[in-house]
Amino acid sequence: SCCITYMFSKVMKERLEKEKLIYTSNTDELTRCLNRHAYENDMKKLNLSEEWVYISVDLNGLKRANDSYGHMAGDELICAAADCMRDSFHEYGKVYRIGGDEFAVIITENPNQVEELIHSFDSNVANWHGKFVDAMTVSYGWVFSTERNWGSAYEISKAADARMYQSKERYYKESGADRR
């Protein structure tokens, strides 16, 4: 009985350590979003014949916030963007931090609801107010996997990036904000 309890305890401890290692290797430490490692693995698994949506998201004015208020302000913005994405998209897909202020969202559940989800995201972003920075703006672009015949999931990501950069151009042109 004592041996069985010991063995059970040892197996459970090893399982928990393995789960923690997997979590750590796939999770961005700052935002708790999935990281680039998880993103690369998941991109390889996406089926181009199924309908899903790729959303490319980028913060506007992060450098300005870092330069004006310090890196704690920049981290606050990055974490806030991640929280807004998680709140809006997590039930329908996955949120990844793939670079400094670059995020990807892959919607696999009910992708036809993407405009509704984007509206929720816009609302979350508009209603956010931080400790160091008062407001946040983001640019994004999205692409349906079924828009045309794509060569790869990466081709879809590049198309979403292009739309996100168009959105970013519009933001800076309309707001008159400094691009730095």
Predicted regions and their residues:
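Active-site-proximal alpha-helical element of nucleotidyl cyclase-like catalytic domains
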Residues: A73-Y92
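Short helix/loop segment flanking the catalytic signature motif in cyclic-nucleotide metabolism enzymes
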Residues: L77, A104-F121
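PAS and PAS-like sensory/regulatory domains
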Residues: D134-S139
